[in-house]
């Protein structure tokens, strides 16, 4: 301004040094201020670019972390869905396999029972056949021995009689023939006795004929007896052969049928075993595949955890770098503020120096040209007065415009803050309502689950009571049956002395029964303990209720961590339960299959041993029967030989008696005299034989009756033993069926508990998934997350702090201008972001340090950040109080007053008005603001 005034007042060529000095000072000021501001703004822009790049990188990292989380959650959901889909399938398969195995076991047991029954029947029939054959052999041997004894006795008697008769005859014939030879010379004398001799000879002949007839009758009777004996023996032999052949045929048929049945059963069992082995291999493969898949999932989860940790570390590093950069930015801003203060001080010093130089120039001009100054005082005064009025009008217009803009900005800011507050309140209300609804739904679901589980526990207790009552009844029945069996066993032991060696087996059966009863009682105790364990599930439900209450009291920030933990726990529990259940089922199936295989092998071995024993016994019986038949044949041949030997002896006796007719006369006479009539001897022998035969038949009948009685008693004892064994088997089968039913019930209860726990976990997972989906949908729709709420709270606090800062700044500005009116700087504030360029208090520094954002969210937030600074700058310009006039600014023609910067402004305005440019002062701030806007759009439009 001073240079312009001097150029107007002084003619060219006068006071060049003063003009050059003035131009140099003003040029240095104009060159220094924009460059410094541009440099500082460029530095700020670079720092903002770096911050924006860091923020974008952090956003990208957060997006990647969220994508990884979503992928992890999707993987967990997929794995959970797969496990859910596979678990019921595998459970159904295991249940079906268990049912099929149980059916197969039942069929096998039925087949084994049938085989055992058939074997028992076969053994009973074989034993009965053995007994019958032995009895028949004994009968035949006894009859044969009796007949042999009878015949031998008869032969001995006949021999004794014959020898006696021979002795008598020999003893009587010797003296008779001697007497006859002595009396032969006297034959003539005894001629009178010839008719008597003739009679005697006739009687001898008659006796010989009778003897011949008797011998013939005896031979005929012996032949008849031998024929009858041979016939009976042949009939017995044929009957024995027929019975043996029939028994052999039957046994062969039974053996072939049993072999066929055993072969069919063995083939079926082998096929079943192969099928079971294939099923086991297939299941083992499935289990190995599932284990591999679970291992892969675990590895993938570990990789995702590692990626999450790395992302978190990167995020923390980025946050630390952002904080460091924010601190550096704050330090740079402080440095820039200090530099601005230093520059303002330098500019003030330069202004004062320019004023001093202008005063010197004026004084020199006044001293050199006093006459010229006397001619132009009125014109200068008029021009100075016009320029002051114009500047005042322009300043007042600018102040009004600034006030209007500031008021409009304040209205907009207030309107925006009110709208944001209303939106936040609505969002908070909606979120609270949603949370209340969720908590109520969770409480209702928990209560419903607790009620359902209580009902289930009551049902289980009722079932257990029924099972206990049934078990008690069964125990009572078993005890009664045990007592009855013990009494029967005692009676049978007392009745049958032959069954004494069978006591240990029965004692072992009783011990087995007691062991089975003890095992059933132990299983009942186990079921009771399992029921107690189920009844003890109520405290965990109460703990779950408490945990729910605690979770309801937690802050909303902990929900995500709890959800993730619950998901991981649920997945782990499902995996553990599935693996444990599969392992338990596999172990049980393996145990059942091993038991079935062992039982089948043992039964097959027993049947083979029994069959081999039966075959050996049959072979021995056949050999014994053959030996007995051979012995009988030999005995018959011996008897035939004896009879044949007896036949020629009789004939020889007859021939020996024929030539001795004379001797017979004396023999018969003496015999008649001694023994009586000759016809009495064969009659007595026949009577004795008949009596002996009758006695022998009576003894045989008695023996047969006794044998029949013994057989009946043995059959009764066998039937009693068989009934006892059947009763024991039935009791054992009942006990086994009861144990199987209890095992099935326990398995069903375990499956029901597992399915219930799985359903609960699935419901809980579904609830958590729905909550996560709702939270994700709300986040996608624009609902406020906890992070958003925190950001909103921070923004609200910052807005409040900025409003407080603006108020304090306006008050301090007013106070400052009221106290120091001469400290106002007339520099261009278009590039400055500081409302107080040369005034910093400790409170202001603290507030500015607090105002430094820890994280710039996005580009719109940067724009709002810059707008807030611009609005602060504008507010500082608008709220600046009007400059009070000092007496130095009053127009006066005196040159002794100090020169002020306002005079320079007046000179500039006067020069512009003199050149005929009245609209330039109003357009000056616009021209100064336009480069600032261009620079701002250039550096902040990324």
UniProtKB/Swiss-Prot annotation:
Keywords from the UniProt entry: Coiled coil
Classification via InterPro entries: FAM184A/B_N
Tagged with keyword Coiled coil: yes
Biased amino acid composition, Acidic residues: 514-526
Coiled-coil positions: 89-150, 196-337, 387-495, 575-619, 686-815
Polar residues bias (residue ranges): 885-900
Basic and acidic residues composition bias: residue spans: 504-513
Family under the similarity heading: Belongs to the FAM184 family.
Name this polypeptide is given: Protein FAM184B
The species this protein was found in: Mus musculus (Mouse)
Top-level taxonomy: Eukaryota, Metazoa, Chordata, Craniata, Vertebrata
Gene: Fam184b
